[in-house]
Amino acid sequence: MSWGLLIDSCLLAFLVTLLAVVVGWCISLFLVGASGWKRVIFLVGVVATFSLPPFFVVNSWLGLFGKVGLLKSWVSIDAYSFGGATWVLVMMFWPVPCLMSFGALKRLTPELLDAEPGIRGFGLLKYVLFPLSYSALFQSGVIVFVLAFNNIAVPAILQVKVFPAQFWVQFSSTYNFQMAWQYGWVLALIPMVLLLAFNGRMIAWPWESQGLDSNVFLERLGYIIRNLSAVLFGGTIVISLLLPLGQLLLNARTWLDFSGAIQAGSRSIFNSFWFAFLTASSVSVIGVLTSSYKVFRLTWLFLFLPGVLLGVVWISIFNRPSLDWFYGGGCMVVTALSLRYFAFGWEGMRGAKNSIDADLVSATDLFGVSWWQRWRHLLQPQVGWAIFAVWYVIYLLCLWDTETVVLIVPPGGETLALRVFNLLHYGHHSQVNALCLILLLLALLPLVLGFVLSLIIKKWLKQDDL
């Protein structure tokens, strides 16, 4: 290990943060100016971009600019470089400042604009919009810095030496716990700084305000700025979302290798779905039970810790003769994933619980309705969608996860994400596309099953009412 790698990691994270914040804020101007169903579609595109697994994004760019990439002979861009890692991470993380700035800018009111009717164009950006979104930019910048600093998958695949990736390589080859504790405190310090940065600060969520009329906003923003932001949005979505998806779906080798990938990775497919399903379900249930206790807000620390550091801690705790029944089994993977992503379950269930009509809760308590009637007539209509959304986010995070499980995965417990991660270390592999397609289908599986199940339940409830 070298402390010089810490400087390289901080430089990489700083560049990614700077570029992601600039791109995200400029695109948020376009989103504020959109309205109706168009805005919904644009927001879905932003969220979908952030939802892509990191190894899938890396694989797409390797397919274009790798050693044998499609465009390598035309464009002399080296994907295996510091600049390549910076580019990929920016394409992954720009939605964070975009969405947070969008939430802040939606707090713009007509009264604020009427106070200075002469401010337009760049003056509006400088004196109104930037100060209004400054807090969101700071918060999102801290989040992106931590995510970029702790990211191991992208630098490791692109062979860029950074502090967290080198920490993982050295520990996995020596299992030197003394070295792990000597350098691991730095990896734990960064998330602590994040928690301090958010202490006492409010986050402007996009759904908390109706925002300004889009026509008024666009008129004050000016022709040049609104068109530049629209071009930037379109280009960024094409590069960061449509290009990776197109490279996957339009590649003939993806479909030729699809059946073979299913046969070769059937066990990994089962492991991926089972680990993600169990973790999302357990975290959601425990999140409901603990949503009243604010002390669990500290669990956000585990989310922003590097997954390999959490794996090292798990090994040091459970690698005991008396715990052989637990160590090296699937339960160890599920508990590690549950701890890392518990903050999402707790925060999501807490928000859902607080959004329920208090008068209706009092009425159900007064009449002593059963738990099924409470769910059917109170919870499901008001927060059923929110509960499923929280569950689904955790499911996706577990499905994509490689860093948490890479050190603790049991024999025969390899997931699809981990298999892709390992294959990409040897360059762009034709079978990787097929495995990524299977992962995307696994991501869509709960949505399909949920839709079918909702139809069955609605039909059953109608018959029950009759």
Question: What is the role of each PLM region?
Answer:
Residues 76, 149-175, 399-430, 466:
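Glycine-rich helix-loop "coupling/hinge" segments at transmembrane-helix boundaries
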Residues 106-133, 160, 356, 362-383, ...:
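Short helix-to-coil transition segments within interhelical loops
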Residues 1-106, 132-152, 182-199, 224-253, ...:
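Membrane-water interface segments at the C-terminal ends of transmembrane alpha-helices
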Residues 115-116, 179-180, 364, 431-433:
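Solenoid-repeat scaffolds in large eukaryotic assemblies
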Residues 199-235, 451-466:
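Transmembrane alpha-helical segments of polytopic membrane transport and secretion proteins
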Residues 63-75, 158-164, 205-213, 249, ...:
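Peri-membrane helix termini and adjoining interfacial loops of integral membrane proteins
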Residues 116-124, 206-221, 255-256, 260-261, ...:
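Juxtamembrane inter-helical linkers in multi-pass membrane proteins
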